[in-house]
Amino acid sequence: EELVAHCRTRLANFNQSLIYNGQNDYSSFAEPLADEFASSGYTIDAALNSNDVSLTTKMALYTYLVDTATINGTNKVIARSEFPALLNQEHNSQTSGGITEISFSMGHELNKKFMLGASIGIPIAKIERNTYYRESDATGDADNDFSYMAYREHYKATGVGFNFKAGLIYRPKEYFRLGLALHSPHIFMLKESFDAGLAADLEQLFSPNTGFDSVASSTLTGGPLDDTRYSLYTPGKII
């Protein structure tokens, strides 16, 4: 007796929506970026061309959201979003995708004593996440060199894998069975892509010119970021 089957199974669901907003008088998005730049020891131009500085910090420097200023005769690193005493903050992250496995299986019974089975699985993965973050001045002061900043990020990962499973059941008696199963290592080949952008309105900072500036990640990397490709292996097992 022989059995052949085809199956499509949803192994994981990544769909998620995360939204929150509120007011903050303690910290800002740009604060850790300013700390990173300050600890690097670089000038602004050197930081913009360094691989040791994160892309987000470079975007903050490019738009003058993070800058240097002379305060009480000392040159210091500043984050302009820390100037207002109160900030409106909002975060919106939308994630979609999942992992679906397509499998092909076959089973065979021999002499009512041996039962053999095998399956090939092809998991297909996709996850996509769009993130938007915004901070704005909640004080109403139009002359403190910060109106708002907005950061957006797009991340995508896709991949396909392979696995194999085989099993044997031996039934010498109706009431007695011996079984053995072999699960091959799971092999996944994945590709990731990423891009981001940041905009800041610094009000009268460059008056009479506009205080608004924006930058895409591709501007700082000389073009779209290369896709990241890698393989993921999980151990096989014998049961």
Regions found by a protein language model. Name each.
Residues 1-239:
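Outer-membrane beta-barrel porins/channels
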